[in-house]
Amino acid sequence: MLRASASGAKCAVKLIVPLHRGFIVRSDIIPLRLRDSEYVESAVSFAEPLQTYSGKKVAISSRSDLTTYFAAAAAGLILRQGSTHASDAGSQALFQMVESDLANRLSFPWIQPGTPRRRTLALVDANSSHPQDGLGFYRAARELGINVVVLENAGHWLEDPAQAHWREAFIPTRLTNPPEEDVGDHILASLRAYGKPVDGIVTFADSFWYYIARIAHEIGVETAPPDSMRIATNKFLTSKYVGHDAYLASNVDEALRIAKEVALPYPLIVKPCDGWSSEGVSRVESPDAFPAAVKSIDTSRHGTEFVMEPYCDGPEVDVNLVLLDGEVLFAEICDDLPKSADVNGLTVGSLTNFHELYSVYPSALPSKELELLIHSFVDTLLRLGIRNGVMHLEGRVQNSSMEYREQNRMMHLQPRAPQATRPEPSAWLIEINPRPLGMTGSHIIESTYGIDYWGLAAVLGVGDKDRARALSQPYRDGPQYTCVMVFIPADFPPSSQGIFDTDDICADLLARRPDLAQHISRCATLVRRGQKVAHPTTGRHTFLAYFNVFSRAGREEALDLARQVREEVRYSFL
């Protein structure tokens, strides 16, 4: 089908008409699954949340009867036409390639049988500090037809009636982090004040899960056992549970005494029990390094208790799992390249911490080691009684057959030299997060595999098992490319004021390097000019920006493009 564009040039359009009877799994599913398609310039959904379709073929009176076409369509596509597609033969070839691409991306039950039912999900902690941040979950819930009841402190921007389109209700609820012991009572009181049943309750702030699990039965919903959530969200308890030689301390003197009494082998990792974003995580090489490591923990955010445990120098990974009744619906693993504080880390500015620098999707570890990680981590979750949800776990492969080596100013996974005495590889769990990985991190899964973790968290949260199974199915042919998330952490001299003095990091780079721009799926600048940013030595980690950089040619090109993006970033601080 052809239509005239605004410039007078012709372009090809394709409409997607459902031929199965039922309701759409989420209203934006077709644009979501077609992101970064080589053949689609833009995709627009015509569907409403939970919209039903008859599944009948379209009967038209003439080729010009566009109204009937559009009325039946769930979405429309404008195809990407190059010079080779200008002729009729070229257009036919384009349509054939599009059909093949659609078969890859839409070969799953995106039309669900039966009658849809709108469900309600309670969310503890809004997970969004301002209207321009962290809306992915709310957008997903809206497209899924799930009502969200937000429990958050009074005065949050979501309480504003002008923002009511993002939620069903806002219930002012006293929340502190770290939580107060009676926070469960506050949550229960708020849900009773809401006065209507909910189909589920979730949080994306890990420290609240234990308290939610304690009161869940009183509102008629199921979660993992409270003690299990306590272990999963406390890094000391997690380490002890999986058998690490871990110790708990609250100050430097206590840490030094323990290290001496039990003769802990250096290097050690010191990290807060209730931490996030790798804040306050240090590698300690000797007793003299303890004071600086403990000082780097922001106790106002993470509390005073910290873990001491052996440092594992194997390749680091993120393992993301979708669980339903103990079954793994989807699993993927990415490589976290060595950080500045790793023994083999790259030098990036003045950073000497565990701030993320690069994450590469999918992992290049051997399939045997990938299977080992998934089997080990799933076994840990199931032994804890955690059987449902989107899980983000971090770990390493101890005694891996691979190691990182620097090549062309970038770290590459390479086979290690064979050793007859090397132990077999084993999975080393760093932490469990009973939630999806961060919002920006989840975007890369969406574009690489076609799966939105935040939408899955919503449908699993309300117990919608059929939609969870459908939305857990990746592209039929696997990841569409290799993608690298390039993190741009705050880095500036400690003597400066820490005032960000740049406009838009991403817009600047895209304008200067259009050759790199065509390999960037998503990017965002996360701070604004004039904003005061904490220095990394304070224990706070701030991302200035991120870029999701992809290559269809393979991992080596993706890593080189990622290196170029980092080197081209420009910013300044006052």
UniProtKB/Swiss-Prot annotation:
Gene3D superfamilies per UniProt: 3.40.50.20, ATP-grasp fold, A domain, ATP-grasp fold, B domain
Which superkingdom heads the taxonomic lineage of this protein's source?
Eukaryota
Record's SUPFAM superfamilies? Glutathione synthetase ATP-binding domain-like (SSF56059)
Name the enzyme's class: ligase
Annotated keywords: ATP-binding, Ligase, Magnesium, Manganese, Metal-binding, Nucleotide-binding
What are the binding positions for Mn(2+) 2 in this chain?
Answer: 431, 433
**UniProt keyword annotation of Zinc-finger present:** no
Cofactor(s) needed? Mg(2+); Mn(2+)
Note describing how the cofactor binds: Binds 2 magnesium or manganese ions per subunit.
Residues the entry annotates as binding Mg(2+) 2:
431, 433
What upregulates or represses it?
Expression is positively regulated by the fumisoquins biosynthesis specific transcription factor fsqA.
| Annotated Mn(2+) 1 binding sites | 394, 431
Amino-acid biosynthesis among the record's keywords? no
What does the record give as its pathway? Secondary metabolite biosynthesis
Q: Which PROSITE patterns match?
A: ATP_GRASP
Binding-site residues for ATP, renumbered to this chain: 263-318
PANTHER family reported in the protein's UniProt record? ATP-GRASP ENZYME FSQD (PTHR43585:SF2), FUMIPYRROLE BIOSYNTHESIS PROTEIN C (PTHR43585)
What is this protein's function?
ATP-grasp enzyme; part of the gene cluster that mediates the biosynthesis of the isoquinoline alkaloids fumisoquin A, fumisoquin B and fumisoquin C; as well as small amounts of fumipyrrole as a shunt metabolite. The products of the cluster lead to a brown coloration and are important for growth and conidiation. The nonribosomal peptide synthetase-like protein fsqF, which lacks a canonical condensation domain, is required for addition of a serine-derived dehydroalanine moiety to activated tyrosine but is not essential for the subsequent steps leading to isoquinoline formation.
By what name is this protein known?
Answer: ATP-grasp enzyme fsqD
